[in-house]
């Protein structure tokens, strides 16, 4: 995902410095060219050799290191950078850079970088809330630097409050948003639905399905990484929502209908990946239905057909993509859905094909439009999401 991208990690003197080893490793696994710069104080918390081992690149600390290469190191590395993250960012380094001071390898390199720079402050709550530090953060924001709001929690000093550096997984998402893909969906509003719905029988039981929401969440994340403004309408799932995506949680088919139709006219692209119940109990018991020896039956009624509604109310220039999960006659049933519901594309899969079912991390899709059918091989759901977006972009140019 980051192949061909250069990421600079600036580490300052903080106990949170050890966490950046996990971030450096994760970036390297995504094929980024990772370069680590440390302040002298940072080396008291973690050894530079750790980062050299994880990244395969020399860890830079001394501005005047005799590396015997005919280049000015801090300028050379700055020119290569696609994104810079200073994490943990101490009050000292925040103050230096906010006021134009550059007296070591890290600060001089940051000053020379023209790419996006992201700071992740880590310090005691009283230091973070100090008016001088807050003023310096405002200065960084004014100059176009991004400063991540620190988390609140138990700090190394024993206090509890704001000042905790976000976890490496969160920091990685900031870097991916900035550098993973070209922003070919910039300026577009994308609505994605994901997950199952739950239709109550009584306060204890419900009708639902096996959808995990993974495919829809992957589409939402990839669209965001490609620059779109993404709204995700999600049924109940166990998945952590992607950062930088507006999430509208829902439970029932009626909830999803109301959430989707409430924002659909504002969208450029709608991708409906949710597995919405076709039927719901006609009557919902206020109390738990007790079992007995007799056979039980539940009278059902149709739910609102969200995709049909969207097709009937599609605005000019809006792209509408549906999903079709089949067990037989996949192409025929999906093409009928495309025509009947006025869709621009259907992403179809067959539950009986290995790797294409619910819950898993892979999918096998066929992208069906008015003019063609494109069969995709087995791939991760994130890669499948990218293929869906590629196709949509090609059809909307």
Sequence positions of predicted segments:
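A cross-family phosphate/adenosyl-ligand binding-site feature
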Residues: 1-119, 124-213, 217-397
